[in-house]
């Protein structure tokens, strides 16, 4: 008689989630057989990719199919009280040092975001907006941050203080990130550590359940394994932990916070209060359509489907065609979010999408489809998120008409983000309530 059996192995830890089949082929399985059993074949070593082992026992031939079940890894719950899921970036409040944005966000307006269904803020800050050249606090910025953090504590909202942009070194008029890692410029490294030492000392008085830190926005040291950044990151974390050991700290993935670099993230041994944070704007030609570095492209874009659908556009803009003559859809986004979540789980860490967005230059139907697929994928994989630009920007869902200074809410997008359904009239009432002019 020949009987078919199945042997299933549970794997509790697997690395390189992008290519699980490659990993499984490199895990040897060796069998110890009881008396009377004999392997039919020339090998006694197998892998976990569906191979079959045939045994002989007396007159019986037994065939076993070898399969692997990758068990989910429970993320260690070190963030029991820092509870966050859906958030907004206060994108220009304390960034862009050449402009004075400090009056743009006021205490009166903070409750609006909670009413719209959000539970946290990411607060990008530029060094030159909150410090002077001697690293003394800008008093107005310091006071506003304390005021804001206190409001979050009193209203059960969370805030992530993000060091968004560093200032240039002395003698230079431009910040160059590579100088952070260059031994010729030790002052850059020392400056970065000093900034976080001062920030930690200043804001350690605020609740660990409500206020968190994010080390740096979109680092990109250009090493394959992010080794330059990892060394500096540990130095900064050591400085923070010497002052505030229990603060939740968001550690950015390398490569402009590419989710593919999550698996390289490093932190101090035994530090439970770490979240790995990434950004997601793929495909870039769609998300940044007619904006910033992609503004020269004037052809068509498409979502879902082939991002650059026209062959004529591909011929006219070959530098974009290489990455955008491909199909992008809900399955691709779901796969990327699944990978990000799995890579975090492999390190027993929560992951967070700190920025995502799509240009308002994109057709509304396509833009909403992209947002819908993004939010569904992040929610399905347990990834908390913070949309880029809450208010009046190229990505925002609250827009200002520059002709008359009136504001409006994209109610379709808001419903995708938070599930809150508003009529146009209700949206106008909320804006008016918080001091925004409406038509």
Task: List the model feature ranges, each with a label.
Residues 1-72:
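Beta-rich interaction/scaffold domains
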Residues 4-9, 96-108, 291-296:
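Short, polar loop/linker segments at the starts of domains and inter-domain junctions
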Residues 79-248, 253-263, 416-429, 434:
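Active-site mouth of glycoside hydrolases
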Residues 140, 177-180, 266-270, 293-295, ...:
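Short, hinge-like loop/turn segments at secondary-structure boundaries
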Residues 186, 190-323, 327, 338-359, ...:
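Active-site region of glycoside hydrolase catalytic domains
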Residues 332-333:
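Alpha-helical scaffold elements lining the catalytic groove of polysaccharide deacetylases
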Residues 362-439:
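Aromatic-rich peripheral "rim/lid" segments of glycoside hydrolase catalytic domains that contact
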């Amino acid at each position: 008689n020949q009987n078919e059996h199945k042997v299933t192995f549970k794997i509790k830890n697997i690395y390189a989630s992008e290519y699980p089949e490659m990993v499984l082929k490199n895990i040897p399985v060796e069998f110890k057989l009881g008396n009377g059993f004999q392997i039919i074949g020339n090998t006694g070593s197998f892998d976990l990719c569906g191979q079959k082992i045939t045994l002989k026992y007396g007159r019986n031939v037994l065939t076993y199919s070898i399969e692997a079940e990758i068990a989910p890894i429970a993320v260690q719950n070190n963030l029991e009280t820092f509870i966050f899921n859906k958030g907004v970036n206060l994108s220009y409040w304390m960034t862009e040092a050449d402009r004075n944005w400090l009056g743009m966000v006021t205490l009166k307006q903070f409750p609006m975001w909670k009413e719209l269904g959000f539970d946290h803020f990411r607060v990008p800050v530029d060094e030159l907006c909150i410090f002077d050249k001697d690293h003394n606090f800008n008093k107005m910025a310091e006071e506003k941050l304390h005021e804001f953090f206190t409001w979050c504590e009193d209203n059960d909202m969370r805030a992530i203080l993000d060091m968004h942009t560093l200032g240039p070194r002395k003698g230079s008029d431009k910040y160059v990130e590579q100088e952070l890692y260059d031994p010729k410029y030790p002052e850059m490294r020392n400056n970065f550590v000093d900034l976080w030492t001062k920030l930690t000392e200043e804001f350690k008085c605020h609740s660990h359940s409500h206020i968190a830190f994010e080390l740096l926005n979109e680092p990109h040291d250009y090493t394959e394994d992010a080794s330059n950044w990892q060394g500096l990151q540990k130095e900064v974390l050591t400085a923070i932990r010497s002052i505030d050991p229990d603060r939740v700290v968001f550690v950015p993935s390398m490569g402009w916070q590419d989710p593919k670099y999550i698996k390289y993230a490093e932190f101090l041994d035994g530090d439970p209060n770490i979240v790995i944070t990434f950004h997601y704007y793929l495909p870039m030609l769609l998300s940044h359509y007619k904006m910033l570095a992609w503004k020269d492209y004037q052809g068509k874009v498409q979502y879902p489907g082939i991002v650059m659908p026209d062959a004529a556009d591909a011929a006219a803009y070959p530098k974009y065609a290489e990455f955008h003559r491909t199909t992008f859809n809900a399955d691709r986004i779901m796969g990327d979010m699944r990978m990000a979540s799995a890579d975090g789980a492999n390190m027993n860490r929560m992951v967070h999408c700190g920025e995502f967005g799509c240009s308002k230059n994109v057709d509304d139907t396509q833009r909403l489809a992209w947002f819908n697929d993004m939010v569904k994928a992040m929610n399905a994989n347990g990834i908390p998120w913070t949309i880029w630009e809450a208010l009046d920007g190229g990505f925002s869902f609250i827009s200002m008409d520059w002709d008359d200074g009136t504001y409006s809410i994209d109610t379709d997008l808001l419903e995708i983000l938070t599930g809150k359904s508003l009529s146009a009239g209700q949206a106008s009432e909320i804006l008016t309530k918080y001091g925004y002019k409406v038509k």
